Amino acid sequence: MAISYADNETIAAISTPMGTGGIGVIRISGKESLTILQTIFRPHNDSCSYRSHQMYYGQIVAADGHQLDEVLVVYMRAPKTYTCEDIVEIHCHGNFLVLQNVLELVIEKGASLAEPGEFTKRAFFNGRIDLTKAEAVIDVLSAKTRKGVDVAQEQLAGSLYRRIEPIRNALVHMRALFEVAIDFPDQSHDIVDYEQIDLQLKTEVIAPVKELLAGVDRGRIYRQGISMVIAGRPNVGKSSLLNAVLQEERALVTSIAGTTRDSIEEMVDILGMPVRIVDTAGIRRQAGEVEALGIQRAKDLINSADLVLFMVDGSRQLDQSDLELYEDIAHKPMIAVINKLDLLAEDGTAAAALLDFVPASVPRLAISAREGEGLEALKQAIFTVVTGSDTPWDEEGCAPNLRHKKSLEATLIAAERMVDDLAQGMGSSDLLSIDMQECLDQLGDIIGITTTDDVFDVIFSEFCLGK
C-alpha cells in the first residue's frame, strides 16, 4: 500500500556489500537519526557540533562503555539528502561482524531494520526522484559492463523522464482543449482544431513513443546481456577461443579430443554487451558415458542460447560430422568460425566447404584462437548479429526497460486509435478525451505518477539492503 514518510519510523541498514573490506557503511534515515547517533557516538573532539555534511572522527560505544569500533560519521540534514530525510552514515572497519554489532546497537536505540530498497523508496515518495530514476539506481548497482553503467547513469540523470515529459505536456494541452469543448459543445469546432490535433498526435506523441519503444530491446541487451555458445566437433579450438576472449587460461587445452567434458561459462564484455560465453564439450557420435553427458548438456545449452559460434577446424577438410552438427543448430542465430588460421589449408578447403552448406546470410570469419588473430573482427560480428548495428547505441536511446514497454505500447495503441478516429470523422471531443487520459495514465505509470502499489512493491523489492 502507498506509504507517507512524513512522520515514519527511522530505518537503518548496512549499505556496503557483505564480506571483508577496508570500509563498511551503516546508513540511518529518519527524524531520530541524529538522536540515535548522539547516544552511541563518542566524538574525538568534545565540542562536536554535528554540522551537516561534515565528517567527525570518534568511537561507537555501547551502553556499558564498551568500544565497538573506531569510526568516521557524517550527519546530513534534511532535505538535502538521498531520502530528503535526516541521514546519518557511520563508516566502520569493513568486517561484517563489526558492522553487525554497530547495526544491532543502532536498532537497540530505536531504529528499525530497513527493507530492501527502502532508502530509495523514501527518496521517491518524498519527491527527490521519479520512478525511472529509482529504477536506474537498480541498474547502476547491477550493471555488468561499463556501457551498462553509462546507460544506467544516463537514466539516473533523468534522460527518460526528459523524453516522456514533452509527450505528456502535449497530451495535457490537447486534453484541456477537449475538456473545454465538452463544456461548450456548440463552440467545439472553434475551440479544437482537429487537423492540428491529428498532426500533434503523429509528431508529438506517436513518433517519440515509437522511438522510445525501439530502445527497449537495446536497453535489455545492455542490462541483461546475451548467452553465446561455442559449438563444434572435438578439438576444433573451442576452449582456446574461450581463453583468448577472456585473456586467461580458463579452460584446459590439449591436443586430445574430448578434453572438455562439461560446459565452462564466463561473462565477457563485447563492445559494451554483457555476453555469457559458454565453452561446450565437442559434439561427436562416438563418446564414452561421461563425455556423452557433456555432449547432451552442450546440445541443451545450444538450444537455449541467443547466439551460436559454429566452429570448424580450418587445418583439415570438413566431413559429414561437421555437416550434421550444422544441421542440428541451423535454426539458431549463428556465426561460422573457421579456426586455426595459422594452420589453414593452403587450398582453402575448409572455407570452400563451409560455403557449400552454410547460407551466405550467415557471417563467417577465419581466426586463430591460439595466436589471437581475427578476434576483434569476431567481436564486431557478434555485436552486429545481436544488435543489427555496426556501432554501439547512444546511452539515451537505451533507457526504456520491459516495464516501460507495456505502458508505451498501450500509449501507442490509444494514440493511433485517436488518429484513426479522426481520419474517419468519428472523433468526438468526449471520446478523444478518454483516449487522451489513457495515454496520460500510461505515461504517468512509467514515471510514477499513476503507478499502482503492487508495481512499487515489485520494483523496490529488487534492491539490496541499505539502498
From Swiss-Prot:
GO cellular component, one term: cytosol
GO molecular function per UniProt: GTP binding; GTPase activity; metal ion binding
GO biological process, one term: tRNA methylation
Swiss-Prot/TrEMBL cofactor(s): K(+)
Top-rank lineage group of the source organism: Bacteria
Chain sites annotated for binding GTP: 235-240, 254-260, 279-282, 368-370
CDD domains xrefs: trmE, TrmE_N
Annotated residues for binding of K(+): N235, T254, I256, T259
Primary location recorded for the protein, binned into one broad class: cytoplasm
Cofactor details (free text): Binds 1 potassium ion per subunit.
Subcellular location: Cytoplasm
Enzyme class: hydrolase
Amino-acid positions noted as binding (6S)-5-formyl-5,6,7,8-tetrahydrofolate in the UniProt annotation, renumbered to this chain: R27, E89, R128, K467
Coiled-coil positions: none
Keyword match S-adenosyl-L-methionine: no
UniProt entry keywords in alphabetical sequence: Cytoplasm, GTP-binding, Hydrolase, Magnesium, Metal-binding, Nucleotide-binding, Potassium, tRNA processing
Pfam families tied to this protein: MMR_HSR1 (PF01926), MnmE_helical (PF12631), TrmE_N (PF10396)
UniProt: Mg(2+) binding residues: S239, T260
PANTHER family the UniProt entry points to: TRNA MODIFICATION GTPASE GTPBP3, TRNA MODIFICATION GTPASE GTPBP3, MITOCHONDRIAL
Similarity comment text for this entry: Belongs to the TRAFAC class TrmE-Era-EngA-EngB-Septin-like GTPase superfamily. TrmE GTPase family.
Chain's role: Exhibits a very high intrinsic GTPase hydrolysis rate. Involved in the addition of a carboxymethylaminomethyl (cmnm) group at the wobble position (U34) of certain tRNAs, forming tRNA-cmnm(5)s(2)U34.
Subunit structure: Homodimer. Heterotetramer of two MnmE and two MnmG subunits.
Protein name: tRNA modification GTPase MnmE
UniProt lineage: Bacteria, Pseudomonadati, Thermodesulfobacteriota, Desulfobulbia, Desulfobulbales
